[in-house]
Amino acid sequence: MLSSGFLLTLFFVTLVIAVLSGLIFLMPSVPVKYIRLHLTLLLLPVIVGVIGLITINGREVIGIFALDKLAWLVGAFVLALGFIIQKFSARYLLGDRNYRKYFPLYTFTTVFASIGWLSNDLRLIVICWGLTLFCLTQLIRLNRSWKVPAEAAKVSARSFIIGWVALLLAVVVFFIGTGDWVIDPSQDYDVSMSYGLKLIVDLLLVIAVIIPAAQYPFQSWLIESVVAPTPVSAIMHAGIVNAGGIILTRFSPVFDNNIALTLLLIISSISVLIGSGISLVHVDYKRQLVGSTMSQMGLSLIHI
């Protein structure tokens, strides 16, 4: 049986290899055919993640990382989806003037997301989440010669900054209330935290999760992002628009205030209706998918 420590080390080694491979592809002297090797290297962390998912029993904390089935599942899912999108992009984007830039940005986006969801330290989660959103913004604005993607990137960046700052403040307030950067699933935070601080954390978490999920009234960033190439829209589903459920799962020992839960329920319900309306009204299939995504994310947050 492979130990969790060995698998975690192997996982990070394969992530580093994937990142370096993406950077190598930026070099003009590297032939375009190198993309085949890059795609092969992208499979390595996915394989390690699947092995970790199969072999893990219970929950193991190794340094600043907490390994359980959810962590390995999300990590492997994000990287697998990233691999599929890059494989599709290898031919779909061929001929694009920014062809070489897409693949390292895809890789960075999924690598940072997967590391964040494996982390047990809230500070690392905030850092990785911020880097993931930054890379996604760069993907949206990659075609700088066209003003429309640049404006879409600005709208997305403003929304992402608000959501990221909300998550950062939630973590800081949590630290003020508990003196710890780690959420302990066995801890009763109704006792260890004051009601006021816990309410603030929960309300900040609501803001932090509804923005990446494109919930009302922050759906404009996803609507504007349809100007980006199809694979860029697809990469948003690699632990980004669906990150709200993951964040709330990680914060579940803290996120149980009735006011925050009711607010999230109302916002998600409104978003489901708006998303359904967008899907019915628009004839553009990408905007129909935006409406579908809003509705699906709203339903997932309602169930949480």
PLM regions with names:
Residues 68, 303-304:
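Adenylate-forming
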Residues 1-104, 179-191, 195-197, 220:
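Transmembrane helix-loop-helix hairpins at membrane boundaries of multipass inner-membrane proteins
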Residues 1-13, 117-136:
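Alpha-helical transmembrane segments and their immediate interhelical/interface regions
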Residues 84-100, 106-125, 135-302:
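Hydrophobic transmembrane alpha-helices and their helix-loop junctions in integral membrane proteins
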